[in-house]
Amino acid sequence: MSNTATSVLNAFLTEIERLKIKTILDSEINGIKKIENKYQVLVNGKKMLFDKIIISIGSKAGLKENNNYELLNSLGIKMTPILPALCPLVLNGDFFNKWSGIRVEARVSIYENDRFLKSDLGEVQLTDYGISGICVMNLSSLASKALYQKKKVKVHLNFLPNIEKENIDKWLTLRDNTLYQRTVIELLESIIPYKLLYILVSKAGIKSNCHYKSLTWEEKNDLINNLSDLTLEVRDTKEIFKSQVVTGGIPISRVKDTLEDKEYKGLYYTGEILDVDGICGGFNLGFAWLSSIVVSEDIC
């Protein structure tokens, strides 16, 4: 296996040539119009008639400009809002320059108006604007939709995901008794990166040279909250051209099982133009291929 996109492309081109399928490349589609039982497509200013059309125009993800969605306006087809998905989250805070560049294992939970939506576990990349990483991107479409609806979105970061919150005090006390005369930071430095740990301890109002047994209950509680439930408000997602995919598009309720439009016979959709998005790991590419197979089997 060459594992290159060029090899896949060449395989398709070879099969297209074998089947003697006519292709018109490097052409701009200026408009689509329904005329009786056919579709009139304006190609490079020239009108062409087709029995069936497959809309497979991708999305705005990764692109600064993509006006292909306007092609469907002339048919009066409405789409759900096109929003970033599989993208980093921009958070509210004044200390992100201090944690920028840190990678840490954590559980990320997302809340909408203080209502839990979903969580994911993995490596979180801490940045100067907020957070990124696969587990963050897997939750980003939920944040996009909630922010679009003007709802308050928060993330809860758990840097001790393998310990129940109610057991952290007991666990820290045991470490403090076992690792004699260690400061709070020294107790945790082998588990959480020092730079991040210093921020979490400072935010709890604790001096870096303090020992855990000397802390007040309030200080311990604040520290435990920062370690296992650091709560930050999501201000925005990164721009759509920096996202890997989008959420939104043609509603699934608008299409048949064959992905043909319920209103316009002979009009089909494949891939990301449909309001379908998945998590990282090839699911979005897989849907693009599978939807193409479904459509091709129906039109042939």
Residue positions per predicted region:
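Short hydrophobic core segments
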Residues: 29, 48-63, 71-73, 124-129, ...
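Flavin (FAD/FMN) cofactor-binding core of flavoprotein oxidoreductases
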Residues: 1-9, 83-94, 237-254
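Feature captures the FAD/FMN-dependent oxidoreductase FAD-binding
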Residues: 1-52, 197, 201
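A glycine-rich dinucleotide-binding beta-alpha-beta segment and adjacent secondary-structure elements
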Residues: 25, 198-277
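An anion/pyrophosphate-binding glycine-rich loop and adjacent beta-alpha core
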Residues: 78-81, 90-214
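Glycine-rich loop(s) and the adjacent beta-strand/alpha-helix scaffold that form part
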Residues: 52-96
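Glycine-rich nucleotide phosphate-binding loop and flanking beta-alpha elements
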Residues: 31, 60-63, 133, 143, ...
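A conserved FAD-binding loop/helix module that cradles the flavin
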Residues: 58-71, 75, 275-300
